[in-house]
Amino acid sequence: MSPYSGSVRRLLDSWPGKKRFGVYRFLPLFFLLGAGLEFSMINWTVGETNFYRTFKRRQAKNYVEEQQHLQARAANNTN
């Protein structure tokens, strides 16, 4: 065991709601951490790129490819 296991256990046991909610008492913490991660991925820019711009670019590329595929398929069906 690591030397931190005792302090981690004390911290987890001191988190309120253990009797009523059990392990589900940590859900608000995970929601907040997830929201913070999402916020940072959208708003923080590394160099010239951030996650949001990259995602939108990939989404637009996939949409264009799908439309081209559908148009090619329609052209083949009419021949």
Curated annotation (Swiss-Prot):
Predominant location: mitochondrion
Ranges per topology, Mitochondrial matrix: 1-20
Tissue distribution: Expressed in the brain.
Phenotype upon loss of function: Adult lethal, mainly due to flies becoming stuck in the food medium post eclosion. Rare escaper adult flies have slow motor activity, reduced climbing ability and short scutellar bristles. Larval motor neurons and adult photoreceptors have a reduced ability to maintain a synaptic response upon repeated stimulation. Enhanced photoreceptor degeneration due to accumulation of ninaE/Rhodopsin-1. Impaired mitochondrial function in larvae.
Function: Required for the assembly and stability of the mitochondrial ubiquinol-cytochrome c reductase complex (complex III (CIII) or cytochrome b-c1 complex), a multisubunit transmembrane complex that is part of the mitochondrial electron transport chain (ETC) which drives oxidative phosphorylation.
Quaternary structure annotation from Swiss-Prot or TrEMBL: Interacts with respiratory complex III components Uqcc1 and RFeSP; the interactions are probably involved in the assembly and stability of the mitochondrial ubiquinol-cytochrome c reductase complex. Interacts with sloth2; the interaction stabilizes both components.
Membership in a protein family: Belongs to the UQCC5 family.
Protein name in UniProt: Ubiquinol-cytochrome c reductase complex assembly factor 5
Organism: Drosophila melanogaster
Recorded name of the encoding gene: sloth1
